[in-house]
Each structure stands twice: as C-alpha cells, then as structure tokens.
C-alpha cells in the first residue's frame, strides 16, 4: 500500500462520464477480489449493493459495527443479507466496556472525534489495510465537505483507490432506483432521518446536520 498518489490513466480517464454501473464494473475488473464495498445501511448502500452484486456476485461487503447502531439498522443488515443471500462482514473496534474503562462514560458527548476514531476510523483502517480499493456511497450533494468527490480517485488517507459511483446522483435518483427495484432500505429514512449513524449521535434531519446535532461536526473521519 502506497500513500503517494499514483497516476493511473486507464483507471481514471473518462470516469466522470461513466454511469454508476460502469464505475462499479471498472473497479471490479481492475481490483476484485481486493475490492470492498463499505455499507452503513443507508439508502445509497441499498443501491450500491444491488449494482455491485449484478456485476460480481462474490463481491466483498463490510460494515462498521460500532455496537450502538439503531435496531432498525441491524434489521436492515439482516434484510439485505436475506435479500441477496450474502454475508456482510462486521468490522468493530474496542468494546464499549473497554472504551468506558479507558476514556470514561459517554465519550461521544465529551469527545465525539475520539469516539468516532475508536469505533469507526480504527476498524476501517484495519479493514482497508488488506485491500487495494473500496467503494463508498458518498454523494456530492450530501454536504459541502463532499462537493468535490470524484467518481474514482486516490484515497490519500488510506493509500488505496476509492470509488463513489453515486457521486453525481441526487437523493431522488437514489429513491427512484430503490422503489423501481423493490430494494430493502433502512426504515429510519421514513421517519425523517436523512443520515443515519449511531443512536447517541443521530437525530431526525433533512441532511447530515442530524448527525452530531448541536455541534459543527459533519464527518466522522472516514472520508476526510
């Protein structure tokens, strides 16, 4: 794994003109089986899992199980596994008990960045250390911090390639695909949750402001 940005014109040339399906196909052709899709069981991943498995039924999919996901999120996890007949891997950090013992109770209130680092960033780093590329559900219109997301680019933070096939999709595009294909999705979206994370740090909202409400935090550290 290299942290310096390589030049790979065959991979990146014309990527912005590709459809989501074409981006996924290009990534699979180049990197499978050293390619993973990261799922947080939000609406984007319903679409991505559907598209990815049509290209490569044996694709590897994982999620960051923080131990404090919503019951509805765990139910969506099971529903997706049943729908596609797959097993979605769980990547986890230290236990909640160990975290409390080392850093005190309710770390998410006092130091949300550290909590995200322990429960998300560290297990993500460990998972990505064994692959050459990953696929994510980032869309440019989700937040100002994501406006410049390329469809295929070099992830300097993790030293691997990263694809965001839905980068230019709107929320309406996502839901159109879900309903047209009768895909399972997280029911919290029907209750006003536009973005879904851990139970302690997520409230209903029309955008990512529902994450870490009351603070200026918009990202958990996975994508920047």
Predicted regions and their residues:
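Nucleotide-activated chemistry modules centered on ATP-dependent adenylation/adenylyltransferase
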Residues: 1-224
